[in-house]
Amino acid sequence: MQQMVPASGYDRAITIFSPEGRLYQVEYAREAVRRGTTAVGIKCKDGVVLAVDRRITSKLIDVSSIEKIFQIDDHIVAATSGLVADARVLIDRARVEAQVNRISYGEAITVEALAKKICDIKQAYTHHGGARPFGLALLITGIDRHSARLFETDPSGALIEYKATAIGSGRPVAMEILEEKYDENMSVSEGMELAIYALSKTTEELKPENIDMAIVKDTGKLVEKITVFEIEKIVKKVYDKIKVENEEAEKKKATENIE
């Protein structure tokens, strides 16, 4: 009878499958993403929205130095969750790929083509010895011609297009909110509110200065970073809405108790 090798014997090399068909190093890389900051992406009728809770852990940190949303090209932007150093490497590579496409073909790269190139790089690091998978997920979004695109990539190199999605530690909660409240006909303004609402449910206190947000509208097709002043107004509006929801829930509960 063949002796089974313990799981620990399969998690030391990226190129070895376990008897159950698992690549443990890829699963560990996904765990790094699950511990990362929460990012939300939403496709709207007139553009796309990305929002990230930067999760500042110390008041001594200069908030402006923590970047979670990166412009790749004029019309493409990406949000990251996971290992910051890994994100920097892939973002730099994505920017190079975007410029190479412009030089080679005389036109901007599409969101889908860029997402696939990044996934090719990620996938290559799952079957080469002497390297480890990238411990991060990316939300890559932008405008292709006249349509919004939103892609999620994970450490294995898998690529999925979404209407709305979330990555990071708050993904389960954020996805529940998005599935309940997302509407394909919502505007970018409404999408920004929904993104902030989803982020607010993943943390005890959501501070405007800790939020990184960007949009791309289908009119100008250019990436636009949202200022803290604008985010403050959205956060206030969202918390006012949450307050009303809580009051209505309490009234409903009180009525049910009386009955």
From Swiss-Prot:
Short name of one Pfam family: Proteasome_A_N
Record has Cytoplasm as a keyword: yes
UniProt entry keywords in alphabetical sequence: Cytoplasm, Proteasome
Gene Ontology MF term list: threonine-type endopeptidase activity
SUPFAM superfamilies in alphabetical order: N-terminal nucleophile aminohydrolases (Ntn hydrolases)
Recorded GO CC terms: cytoplasm; proteasome core complex, alpha-subunit complex
Main location: cytoplasm
Membrane spanning residue stretches: none
Localization terms from the record: Cytoplasm
InterPro entries: Ntn_hydrolases_N, Proteasome_alpha, Proteasome_alpha-type, Proteasome_asu_arc, Proteasome_asu_N, Proteasome_sua/b
Record carries keyword Cytoplasm: yes
Gene Ontology terms: biological process: proteasomal protein catabolic process; ubiquitin-dependent protein catabolic process
Listed PANTHER family: PROTEASOME SUBUNIT ALPHA/BETA
Subunit-level organization: The 20S proteasome core is composed of 14 alpha and 14 beta subunits that assemble into four stacked heptameric rings, resulting in a barrel-shaped structure. The two inner rings, each composed of seven catalytic beta subunits, are sandwiched by two outer rings, each composed of seven alpha subunits. The catalytic chamber with the active sites is on the inside of the barrel. Has a gated structure, the ends of the cylinder being occluded by the N-termini of the alpha-subunits. Is capped at one or both ends by the proteasome regulatory ATPase, PAN.
Role noted for this protein: Component of the proteasome core, a large protease complex with broad specificity involved in protein degradation.
Name of the featured protein: Proteasome subunit alpha
Species name: Methanococcus vannielii (strain ATCC 35089 / DSM 1224 / JCM 13029 / OCM 148 / SB)
Gene that specifies this protein: psmA
